[in-house]
């Protein structure tokens, strides 16, 4: 039976209950490890933001954060789970400028027009559409003019041929619907492509303010 993470309370409970024995690196195995994931699936699309202000939403235990902290001039991380923030801070310390605990749908504590890049990996795939829309509204607020966002989200429609493959708690979202939400806030998609896992297909959407 699939597990639904996209309710904020459920996501909070899951974060508290999950053992994190491998610090999230188990989810990188399909890419040949976390370093390969970064080098092949993420870095080519964010390397232009070297020495820029970057915000990461839902860093977990810092799996991707470790690379972003080297790339960015100033890195801010924001997460629903205080334990994740604490552990990431213990790992990376002053290499991350700001550590923020949020409510799972807003970017309170991040200034308007202050970020050149907003990025999230492995979290939006579990979020309900309404939560994603709240985040998109907030991403628009914090991005600097011309700034970009790199979001890994699900490509799953309940009741479609893909629904039988939803064994990873994917929320109902499609590239088309994600694009519509972005356009509603005056932003535009600059690149969109799929990432295939053994059991599901997800989408990366890169959009610009």
Model-identified regions with their sequence ranges:
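Class I (Rossmann-like) S-adenosyl-L-methionine-dependent methyltransferase catalytic domain
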Residues: 1-50, 57-108, 127-134, 148-209
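A short acidic, Gly/Pro-enriched loop at the edge of an enzyme's catalytic core
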Residues: 108-118
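A short glycine-rich, Lys/Arg-flanked "PGG" loop and its adjoining helix->strand segment in the class I
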Residues: 133-145
